[in-house]
Amino acid sequence: MLNLYMWKLSRSQVYQASLLFGSRVISALAFTNTGLVLHGPRRWYTTDNGFLLHRDSKVSLADYIHESTFDPSKGYYSRLWTGSTNNLSHSVHVLRKEGHKCSKEFDPFLHGIPIPQKALNIYEKQRSLFSESISNYLVLQYKLRYFPVFDLKIYDFHSGTGIIALDILDYLYKNHLEVYGRTTYNIVLHNSWQASWFKSMLTSVRYAKHGDHIDIYVSDPLTWNHTDTNPCFVLALQVISSFGHDLFRQSNGAMMMERCWLGPEHFLNEFFTLNTHQKVSSLNYHLAFQQARINVQQGFSDSRAKRYFSGVKQVFWSFFSTQKLTYYPTKAIRFFERLSKQFPHHSLLLMDVCHVDKSLPGINAPSVLSMENDFSTKKMSSNIGHVFQNETVKYVFPTPLYLVSDILQLATHNRSFICSLPHFLRRWSNEHGRKFFVPVEPSSKNLKVPYSFNNYYVVSSMPTYYY
């Protein structure tokens, strides 16, 4: 940016200019010892090769305000500019309306009125598409590698309402009966209420035939002690984002490492240190990373942790940020470590949200923005909240799946492949499922793929050997 003009204006003249060109002009002017300096945009022109280059030129104040207001490439003050801001994106009226919707949905539960759980997840929106794709993927991998020597064993962690599990078994029953007869579907749920509801589903006429093929467990994935040395498939659909990972933030007001809690039930550990911005050697961890290292090693064998943690450390450096709240997926490492120890011949299919669009509407969306638990600043944080009808807002973060994929290879020594969710569904769904995806521009009105699908990614991890 260039210093274009130097004015000797009084504060009253600046106020008159703001009335003429808009209040944003005040933020575009900076007081100096000699007057006021306007920081203006750079002009752009197109070369013969089609490249955009800039040249510095003087513009009038009126032209600058006009151009930067309506053209996002001309300046910081554009109305179309989509950069970050500290202001709340909703007005008081919109926030009050959303609060009324929340209270309307939560009041029956607070008064003891039983209401069914309404888990807003992406899988139940296109049930047939997901069940077809996951089933075809499992059947192909099973027939190529393990059939007919081993049975098909599936371990599904945090399967929600279990609808996807039942749909997968239905699909195998109708299309791959020889595989269905050798299938055992193990479902690991995190509370007894879901287990009882799922057992009631199995008593219905439609799903009663699957009762002999399903085993239900109630446990935390990080504490479940079940072991299976046979080849098996593990499904982790939106599991990593539900873990409370360790968070780190640079804070000038913290004289020592502190630990605070966000939320009464769903905890996020937040560590403060003054040394996170300094480059340190491999033998001198900064306090936050050292604490993360201790947390990760809890429950690990020392030899196993030391063997791959040096590689994980290098991945962490590329992801580390000192300017905003970030986190290390330390519980994901513990989860992968337990899979490697308790299921040594497993193949993992992991699906999770990789980024979140902050313009998603209110409580009826799969994920909504939540206010940071800091009532003194009232700043919007980058975390999101999954809203359930009979549960409080749970603070989670989008999962950096490219980082998770690298950590997965270090922890399990399996080969990992990552792709977008639309690509996975288009690759493994049947013919009518492929018609769901239309290769058109995102701005087209004929786009049939929900936008939220583009926020999800799939990680496929398989052993490097074949039986």
Swiss-Prot record:
One of its GO terms (cellular component) is mitochondrion. One of its GO terms (molecular function) is protein-arginine omega-N symmetric methyltransferase activity. Its EC number is 2.1.1.320. It catalyses: L-arginyl-[protein] + 2 S-adenosyl-L-methionine = N(omega),N(omega)'-dimethyl-L-arginyl-[protein] + 2 S-adenosyl-L-homocysteine + 2 H(+). Signal peptide: none annotated. It is found in: Mitochondrion. Keywords: Methyltransferase, Mitochondrion, Transferase. GO terms for biological process: methylation; mitochondrial respiratory chain complex assembly. It comes from the Eukaryota. Belongs to the NDUFAF7 family. Arginine methyltransferase involved in the assembly or stability of mitochondrial NADH:ubiquinone oxidoreductase complex (complex I). This is Protein arginine methyltransferase NDUFAF7 homolog, mitochondrial. It comes from Schizosaccharomyces pombe (strain 972 / ATCC 24843).
